[in-house]
Amino acid sequence: IPGADDTPLNAYTVKPGSFDEDRPHAVLMYVYGGPGSQTVTDQWGGRRMLWFQYLAETYNVVVVSVDNRGTGGRGKAFQDIPYRDLGTPEAADQIAAAQSLADSSWVDADRIGIWGWSYGGYMTLMSMLTGDGPSTFTSGLAVAPVTDWRFYDTIYTERYMSTPQNNEAGYERGAPLNYADQMADTQDLIIVHGDYDDNVHFQNSVQMVDALQEANKQFQFMMYPGRNHGIYGGNTRLHLFTMLTDFIEESLIEEEPIIGATD
């Protein structure tokens, strides 16, 4: 799939068994996108892939994942593109990929969502709120997102961004907090965070919630008390993925679920 600068980007799709290339489908893009990472690999995707297959078979959604510039497996020059500019080129690639998909006969351009966790939650917000994102993505699900790199640990952040004193413009440009007012009234957004998150601190989502409220944007927010970055424990995961599935159904799906798929 072509990125923002027409660089070919690695991608995978999870399609329903009844896939028809002449029928428009809703698309859910799964993103991580962080430096040196990969979601597109020649291996089984684990439990998350089971959820993607469930969504595809139950709701006729096509799940797509794209490795933007800055991810791994493509050489140092490719990985170094977001240096001192985290979030900007990566989000531009996700937006460009979504727009390219929108031109396909099997995609309903009015039903393209994006979701991710941690750096992927950050990418979800950046992709929804910057550039052409507000007119490209119908919905977004941001789990444990970074919302300002000043809130994240220095060992990771300064490796890619230098310090705020030496790269103020990069920090400002890469903060979803600064784009809260760009959220379109037609977009649906849910933010999820555990308040004991010791990786991406809960402060990130609190500040994002405050910015969205200040901009009078309507959205959903779920906090998991006593849960860390993985949002595990008790009935938490069942509640989380039931909620995410319901949100996808409400924001992206037009037809009834396939009979028997949820049994």
Each language-model region and where it sits:
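Serine-hydrolase catalytic core recognition
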Residues: I1-D263
